[in-house]
Amino acid sequence: MVEAQLVLPAPAKLNLMLHILGRRPDGYHELQTLFQFLDYGDELGFALRQDGVIRLQTDVPGVAHDSNLIVKAARALQKQSGCTLGMDIWLEKRLPMGGGIGGGSSDAATTLLGLNHLWQLGWDEDRLAQLGLTLGADVPVFVRGHAAFAEGVGEILTPVDPEEPWYLVLVPQVAVSTAEIFSDPLLTRDTAPIKVRPVPKGNSRNDCKAAVERRYPEVRNALNLLGKFTEAKLTGTGSCVFGAFPNKAEADKVSALLTETLTGFVAKGSNISMLHRKLQIL
């Protein structure tokens, strides 16, 4: 196996709040959400190829190759830039699929930034984020790498700096269908818009929570268990749920109690993604 020339993280994200303001004529929903990164995520390795081939390697079952966002991101950048080089890409998967913590979108953003570096394209963040948006609404925030208040379908980003607590994230063993939740007839779609600043704290609910709890008892159970120790929230459309703690020791203590029956992890909130911290020292 060829040795990776560059190894980069693909961090998780949390939606600290998610409000649905209405449905647009094109069927998409107008949102307001607050993204923050975690110092925890997938890891991608990259090695240049001279033959133009994009090849993804992973041992994780269920990760489709040609339809994977990593491959789509690489081929889109290759096409748009006219680059004739290829890339071997290795994925070490830690983030759950269908978990609402941005695994696929983060992998795509890390791919765009990694290939931009190794192919020496010189694209700026604006151009990479614009390409990222064609892959998914959450990709641009990972490309930019700063915690953000997002509007529109999630593509209008305003950098913000919320507090950076420790989080316990629980991972119910179920993949939530985002399309199913957003088509739920009982989904709240008329929340009044809020201002970007001050950073939302008190008004920080997730409008998808009730619909997810109705359809996925595993998520409801995780929220109830975590809610005995701290305010339990849903990230995105789930399935992951999370709670904030003032320090790692308290998060670890609750994790030890809950992860006997549930999968989960403890991670620090970060307003600058660990991907961008790594890129800054290259």
UniProtKB/Swiss-Prot annotation:
ATP binds at P96, M97, G98, G99, G100, I101, G102, G103, G104, S105, S106. It catalyses: 4-CDP-2-C-methyl-D-erythritol + ATP = 4-CDP-2-C-methyl-D-erythritol 2-phosphate + ADP + H(+). The keyword Calcium does not apply. One of its GO terms (biological process) is isopentenyl diphosphate biosynthetic process, methylerythritol 4-phosphate pathway. The active site is at K13, D138. Its EC number is 2.7.1.148. The keyword Nucleotide-binding applies. Keywords: ATP-binding, Isoprene biosynthesis, Kinase, Nucleotide-binding, Transferase. GO terms for molecular function: 4-(cytidine 5'-diphospho)-2-C-methyl-D-erythritol kinase activity; ATP binding. This is 4-diphosphocytidyl-2-C-methyl-D-erythritol kinase. The gene is ispE.
